[in-house]
Each structure stands twice: as structure tokens, then as C-alpha cells.
């Protein structure tokens, strides 16, 4: 019955409102206002949490978040922290204000990320994702190069390589060439997909690996 009315917002959905007016003095008449709608939307709900990742320096892996609910335009702000518990700063890089983010990968180390999600219209609570870890590791490198072999027929000498760093499972494929510069093909024999390879020695000659 007042000139200002605060519509209930406890029930999700759309309700139509109007105000009726009446002047008790004779001849002043009565009537009603235009109809207006009040739409109550559910709060933002995170349906897909971002997943942490481990990659080599200069990688381009992405993290993604998805939500439902909210009212009006939904905004996203990825944030980064050195420890995941203390201070948070707005992140930089491709997609830092979108649902899909590519964290910087030029600096080796561990950093922690989360996303702040807000709806443009009033009344919707801010949503914050879980904290995820991003590990940037040094690129794969060879610390021990294979060395040449000179052996007799039916010898069992091995070629050996040692690697360091990298991310995930390291795979090895030994290759052979008749001249060391071209026509490289995958080698066969014991250990051809491991760090320790025993090249075939059933015929004389020189091969490159």
C-alpha cells in the first residue's frame, strides 16, 4: 500500500506486478499502472570446475569453467596466487576474463589459480571455483648423449641415452640412417623404444643411430 514496494525474491520465476490507485475524493477516479515483470533467477552454480595441469615451458594447455544460473551478463576473472592461500591477483594471459584460460608458461614453477564469477544484475551471489595447481616444468633435455660402438658380428653392445625434465611419460624411438644425414627410419631390435638400445650386429658395415 506504499509508493515503494520491494518484491519478494525467495522464489525463482517471473511474476507480473501492477499498482492500483484510488482517490477517495468524489470525481478523482481510480485506475492502475502499467504491468511490470520481476524475474528472480537462481544464483550462479558452477557445473564444471577447472582442472589443474602440468606442462613444459611454452606450453599452451587451457583450463575451463562452466556455470549455470545468474541474472544478466556473467563475468569471469581468473586469479593467480603463489601459494593458493594468501594474496590473489588478477591473472594475465589469453582468456583471463573468459571461460577458457591459457595460463602463462614461460616461467618454470608452481602457481595456483581460481575463477571469480559474477552476474551483472543485483542480488546474485558471487561464485568462486576450487583452487587448482598449474606446474610448469623445464623442457625435455638430453643429459647423456649416445656414444659410437665398434663391435664384432653378433655383438651385444648398447647405445644409451639419458634425459631430464619434461612433463608426463617420456617416449623413446631409436632411428637409423645409412649415411647419418637422411633416410631416417625407425630402428628395430631390442630396446628400440627404450633409453637402452642394442642395435642389430648380424652384418658388417656402418650405420648411424
What residue spans do the PLM features occupy?
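Surface-exposed, flexible coil segments in extracellular/virion-facing regions
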Residues: 1-9, 80-105, 176-200
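Core motif of extracellular immunoglobulin-like domains
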Residues: 18-19, 65, 78, 114-115, ...
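Short, solvent-exposed loop/turn segments at the edges of extracellular beta-sandwich modules
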Residues: 22-29, 118-125
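Extracellular interdomain linker/stem segments of modular secreted and single-pass surface proteins
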Residues: 39-45, 135-141
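Surface-exposed, proline-enriched loop/turn segments that connect beta strands in immunoglobulin-like
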Residues: 47-52, 144-148
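Short, solvent-exposed loop/linker segments at the N-terminal edge
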Residues: 53-59, 149-156
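A short beta-strand segment in extracellular, disulfide-stabilized domains
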Residues: 59-67, 155-164
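Solvent-exposed loop segments of extracellular immunoglobulin-like
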Residues: 69-80, 164-176
